[in-house]
From Swiss-Prot:
The lineage of its organism: Bacteria, Pseudomonadati, Pseudomonadota, Alphaproteobacteria, Hyphomicrobiales. The keyword Coiled coil does not apply. This is Transcriptional repressor TraM. Negatively regulates conjugation and the expression of tra genes by antagonizing TraR/AAI-dependent activation. TraM may either bind or modify TraR or AAI making them unavailable. Alternatively, TraM may bind tra promoters preventing TraR activation. The gene is traM. GO terms for biological process: negative regulation of DNA-templated transcription. It comes from Agrobacterium fabrum (strain C58 / ATCC 33970) (Agrobacterium tumefaciens (strain C58)). Keywords: Conjugation, Plasmid, Repressor, Transcription, Transcription regulation. InterPro entries: Tscrpt_rep_TraM, Tscrpt_rep_TraM_sf.
Length: 102
């Protein structure tokens, strides 16, 4: 029979978080998860603002590259990476905590 950790690591995106959070009190894990959700929300807003500021030719994909476009891409990478952390923390926690708007 597989251990609980082995089963969990098969279901999560960022397996190192399983080890990093092992043994944490549930309240601490919930706080980490809520903070990660809030950070993700900020990153979504930032990426959206940068996308909205792009010229239409970039939004439509007719043009690519350049400093402004790269800033948007970097923000999107950060946002998606944070979403992986959020998803993993929610899997470890076992539920989606109530993360009120900050």
């Amino acid at each position: 029979m597989e251990s609980e950790d082995a089963t969990l690591t098969k279901k999560v995106e960022l397996r190192p978080l399983v080890g990093l959070t092992r043994g944490l009190h549930p309240a601490d894990l919930e706080k980490l998860t809520i903070d990660a959700i809030r950070a993700h929300r900020r990153l979504v807003e930032k990426a959206d603002e940068l996308f909205q500021a792009l010229p239409e030719s970039y939004k439509s994909g007719k043009e690519v590259g350049g400093p402004q476009h790269l800033c948007y891409i970097e923000a999107s990478i950060e946002m998606h990476a944070q979403m992986s952390a959020v998803s993993t923390l929610i899997s470890i926690l076992g539920y989606i905590p109530n993360a009120t708007v900050n």
